[in-house]
């Protein structure tokens, strides 16, 4: 089932945008609350409203090594303090439609979305978030700002993510030679991207390599091409998507 932008209803309460995706023939109703952080030009998504269990899973994941490493790398890459990568709106009468745990959209697209067992909801959530970001990053070239991003632009953006995801599913780690997405442990199903080259590694193997090199006093070189690297970025995809 494909994401359909015509099924979106948009409303807002205070500084929160509420997106409702309603597909009655297929019995799908998904509500996504989004906060735009003007200072950092980024977005925070309410995972409590998507599914209350996701918030508890996220808090548990964040305490694990993979979660701590991911949060550290995301903070470094975005320039946002770790404590500012999440926001909470309290549950009270005034906030009953928007309360919950809001997390940086990167965490939703690359981490939390994999905890949703319904693949159709996964696909629609990814499309909904990317659609919203595409619309809000688009600057209309009209005096009254009435033009919105075209259907073709939306399709191109979604196609890019789907293509990267499709290719990522087949990629093998250059150290253990296992398909990254097929690894037994969920925390191992991430790529470790080097800033020096495009060789593919799972996050676990490249972190072990990095730690061993440091412990022995060796330089941080790619295990394959030996090009020196400075940073390892944890990612759900085999390459960064711009």
Swiss-Prot record:
UniProt record, GO biological process: protein polyubiquitination; symbiont-mediated perturbation of host apoptosis; symbiont-mediated perturbation of host ubiquitin-like protein modification
One GO cellular component term: host cell cytoplasm
RING-type zinc-finger residues: 173-226
Q: Which residues form a coiled coil?
A: none
**KilA-N domain segment(s):** 21-131
Q: Report the Gene3D superfamilies cross-referenced here.
A: Zinc/RING finger domain, C3HC4 (zinc finger)
Known catalytic reactions: S-ubiquitinyl-[E2 ubiquitin-conjugating enzyme]-L-cysteine + [acceptor protein]-L-lysine = [E2 ubiquitin-conjugating enzyme]-L-cysteine + N(6)-ubiquitinyl-[acceptor protein]-L-lysine
- Keyword check for Oxidoreductase, yes or no: no
The scientific name of the source species is Cowpox virus (strain Brighton Red)
- Enzyme Commission designation: 2.3.2.27
- What is the name of this protein? Host range factor p28
Gene that this sequence comes from: OPG021
Function in brief: RING-finger E3 ubiquitin ligase which catalyzes the formation of both 'Lys-48'- and 'Lys-63'-linked polyubiquitin chains. Plays an important role in virulence by acting as an anti-apoptotic factor.
Keywords noted in UniProt: Host cytoplasm, Host-virus interaction, Metal-binding, Modulation of host cell apoptosis by virus, Modulation of host ubiquitin pathway by viral E3 ligase, Modulation of host ubiquitin pathway by virus, Transferase, Ubl conjugation pathway, Zinc, Zinc-finger
Q: Which family does it belong to?
A: Belongs to the orthopoxvirus OPG021 family.
Tell me where it resides: Host cytoplasm
Q: Name one GO molecular function term.
A: acid-amino acid ligase activity
